Amino acid sequence: MSVPRSSGAKAIAKAGQEYRDGDYESAIVTLASATVDENDYLDLAYLLGLCYTRLHRFDEALLYLEQVVTQGAGDTRTLQCRMTLAYIYSMTGRAKLAEYELTKLVESSGESPQVCSALGHASWKQGRLDEGLRWYAKALDLAPENPTALNGYGYLLACAGKDLDMALTCCRKALTEDPGNPAYADSLGWAYFKLGNLDEAGPYLRSAAEALADNEESAAHVQEFERAVRSR
């Protein structure tokens, strides 16, 4: 005889569909009104954490995601929550915490292009550029056409002033894969700038800065570019 699903389980199933439909606010409302038992709570926390992340309500997302990671069984859901925590910490300038979560992911599930790329970014943000390059190189060994890894590796090469032709090639490939990504446009513009090709650099750097209006790094690139133009 089948056991009837609890009202909490039904609410979680409904919220899951709302999440997949991109209706994150409705999913939160559905879950907020649900009464769940202990067995269903981590399912609820998991969905709430993902919904709040999608809405960039990061403080609320952390509250739930950390519960899943702490109490979870090391399953796929727990790994996803660790990756999401790393994303939030990266977005909010907490690179050391992002690195901690990513290192735990490597320990539990091994290296992947996504995790290696994220570790490259976290290392660079903490001032360890050479280590960042090594992580991005690992990501490219695993997935040579991965645009995140291509962009990160190319950008860090440009920042270091190393192998600038390779930097340009990687950044160009990344933008070709994702032409609407302003961060990739900024990286390509920066690679051109480092090569001394101001005519090519300008359109990419300016369009990226316009799209990334609150990004200090992109704005700094444009300022340095404009100083170079005035002085040539």
What are these regions (language model features)?
Residues 47, 84, 118, 152-153, ...:
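Canonical tetratricopeptide repeat
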Residues 39, 73-76, 110, 144, ...:
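Short coil turns that delineate tetratricopeptide repeat
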Residues 19, 53, 90, 124, ...:
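Position-specific recognition of the canonical hydrophobic site in helix A of tetratricopeptide repeat
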Residues 22, 56, 93, 127, ...:
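Residue-level detector of the short coil/turn that links helix A to helix B
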Residues 44, 78-81, 115, 149, ...:
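TPR alpha-solenoid repeat register
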Residues 16, 50, 87, 121, ...:
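Residue-level recognition of tetratricopeptide repeat
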